[in-house]
Design a protein with these regions (language model features):
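Accessory beta-strand-rich segments of carbohydrate-active enzymes
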Residues: 2-20, 27-36, 50-54, 82-86, ...
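Mature N-terminal segment immediately following signal peptide/propeptide cleavage
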Residues: 41-53
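Surface-exposed, flexible loop/turn segments at secondary-structure boundaries
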Residues: 57
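Aromatic- and acidic-residue-enriched carbohydrate-binding clefts of CAZyme catalytic domains
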Residues: 101-103
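Hydrophobic residues on conserved beta-strands that form the core of alpha/beta folds
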Residues: 46, 71, 121-122
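Generic detector of ordered secondary-structure context
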Residues: 41-44, 66, 117
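Short Gly/aromatic-enriched secondary-structure transition segments
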Residues: 60-80
Length: 163
């Protein structure tokens, strides 16, 4: 499947290859892991990620998700964290109904592709040895608008509102 930018404004597409909502319990391999509250069944990806902010989708780096892509223009950002509170884009305050208020005359599900900031994140990691050969799922808990996910250069899925 090829990811499409128009999914952002298509109300019939809100998830592609996403698991159904479910209870998110923490599971442990052993009683000792439970006592220590550290599960070898999870691999946190918190920390510093490669990052570049773009003012709109057309300005985002093309093909940054490909294996071996040149990320020399990327900075870093702490994950978890909001890009706006880390110096990128404009903060959204609760006294403004929508981020585009006063800038664009939009009605949902329209998206102003000329004024829709994009954060492009990249992270390299090795899967923990205990997880190799197992079914592995990735969870993003806090993507504000929408996200497209690639792993090892292959499109994995699309999701909106991961809160």
């Amino acid at each position: 499947m090829t990811p499409e930018l128009n999914w952002l404004s298509d109300p019939t597409v809100f998830a592609v290859n996403r698991l159904d909502a479910h209870s998110d319990h923490v599971c442990y391999r052993t009683v000792q892991e439970a006592a220590q509250r550290h599960s070898s069944l999870r691999q946190p990806l918190d920390g510093m990620w490669r990052f570049v902010w773009s003012s709109c989708p057309a300005q985002r780096p093309a093909d940054f998700w490909r294996e071996g892509a040149d990320l020399s223009g990327f900075g870093t950002i702490r994950v978890p964290g909001h890009m706006e509170t880390q110096g990128y884009g404009q903060l959204q305050y609760t006294n403004t109904l929508y981020p585009w208020d006063g800038r664009s005359a939009l009605r949902p599900p329209q998206v102003d592709l000329n004024d829709d900031p994009v954060g492009s994140y990249a992270r390299e990691f090795d899967l923990d040895a205990g997880l190799r050969g197992q079914r592995v799922c990735i969870s993003f808990q806090g993507v504000e608008q929408a996200m497209y996910l690639w792993c090892n250069g292959k499109f994995v899925g699309y999701a909106e509102d991961s809160f």
